[in-house]
Amino acid sequence: MIEVVAVKAILVSKSGPLQAMRKQEWTQRFATASNRITTLADVNDRPIGVFDSGFGGLTVARALIDLLPNEHLVYYGDTARYPYGPRSLDEVRGFARQISEWLINDVGVKAIVIACNTASAAALTELQAECHVPVIGVIEPGVRSAIEATSQGRVGVIGTVTTIASGAYQRAFAAADPGVELVCAACPGFVEFVERGDTDSDQALVLAERLLAPVLDAKVDSLLLGCTHYPFLARTISRVMGRDVTLVSSADETAFAVRRALIDGTIPARIAATPGERRWLSSGDASRFQQIGEQLLGIGLTAVEHHDCS
């Protein structure tokens, strides 16, 4: 039986130099957007914006829908520019800024959830400083849950090349519990398998056996899935790691973090008791996004729209 543990906090991460625009210019753009949308609709009734490089963030979106069924939600999958993993932090930071500006300016979201570990590692700190709506990410929740899940103090983290190289997880674990023995492994190729809807094939298993060797050899007892795509590969990953290793995902507790922000007023909660509306967008092929998204989630998606934020 595969055990995927929910996690408990909001991601914090650090990032490198600013890209393209100076920080104050981005801050002004976000401020202008925020001022515009405040007059367009009641703040409480505005949607929560969620974005990822593609399908991975759907794990977070599903958790939000299950936990907060009355909240409106807008999901943006940047499939035209996926995968983010091999790209530089500066480039990913630029993408995150473009998407966030569009979500605030044109969509009018009241909060943003960065449902992508690579984008969180690259841009969370900057977006929290620049945006005039709350911005929540997905790293620190997983860190805390992985620490809670380990009984021997040996924790593995798998993620994209850029996420692992950023040091975001290493810093977060060092801050949370310096005594944890941490083994990190980049898993290039995992995201592409998920984006193709191939999560349980022999080819996926062969790749997993090769990429997971460092954490398997280290005999970790808790493995943090440091990419929101990876829960879709949980069955394959568990076949390699074995039943004694607890897989940790941040989707559920990221949703709990949003709920806490709604309860304490950080994010204005929707008052109406009617079910929230869902809107799904992709920068790539909208029909393919709908097909693969429904296959991965096991639920129907309303008509997926195409939108290019670049």
Residue map of PLM features:
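Intrinsic disorder/low-complexity segments enriched in small, polar and charged residues
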Residues: 14-15
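Non-catalytic structural scaffold of enzyme domains
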Residues: 30-310
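Extreme N-terminal basic, low-complexity initiation segments
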Residues: 2-10
